Amino acid sequence: MKKGIHPNYSEVTVTCSCGNVIKTHSTVGRDLNLDVCGECHPFYTGKQRDVASGGRVDRFNKRFSVPGAKK
């Protein structure tokens, strides 16, 4: 490997907003702050909530539905 062309690879501390601290190595050169990590992300914790906001079809059906009509 050539000398002087590679970035410095140092240990950094990654801190999540939930308080989880991860020590890793990176070329960033400074400590990082995360909003979400594997300890608090809803997908990994199993605390997901189903977002059923509806789409364009649901909005159309709601707007133009006839009250009392059969479905």
UniProtKB/Swiss-Prot annotation:
Q: Which Pfam families match?
A: Ribosomal_L31
Q: Which cofactor does it need?
A: Zn(2+)
> Is Ribosomal protein one of the keywords?
yes
* Gene Ontology cellular component terms for the protein in this record: ribonucleoprotein complex; ribosome
Listed A to Z, the keywords are: Metal-binding, Ribonucleoprotein, Ribosomal protein, RNA-binding, rRNA-binding, Zinc
Q: Does the keyword Mitochondrion apply?
A: no
State any single GO MF term: structural constituent of ribosome
Q: Disulfide connectivity?
A: none
For Zn(2+), which residues are the binding ones?
Answer: C16, C18, C37, C40
Q: Give the note describing cofactor binding and stoichiometry.
A: Binds 1 zinc ion per subunit.
Q: Which GO terms describe its biological process?
A: translation
Q: What sections of the sequence does the record tag as coiled-coil?
A: none
Q: What does this protein do?
A: Binds the 23S rRNA.
Q: Which family does it belong to?
A: Belongs to the bacterial ribosomal protein bL31 family. Type A subfamily.
Subunit structure of this entry?
Part of the 50S ribosomal subunit.
**Identification of the protein by name:** Large ribosomal subunit protein bL31
Per the UniProt record, the lineage of the source organism begins with: Bacteria, Pseudomonadati, Pseudomonadota, Gammaproteobacteria, Enterobacterales
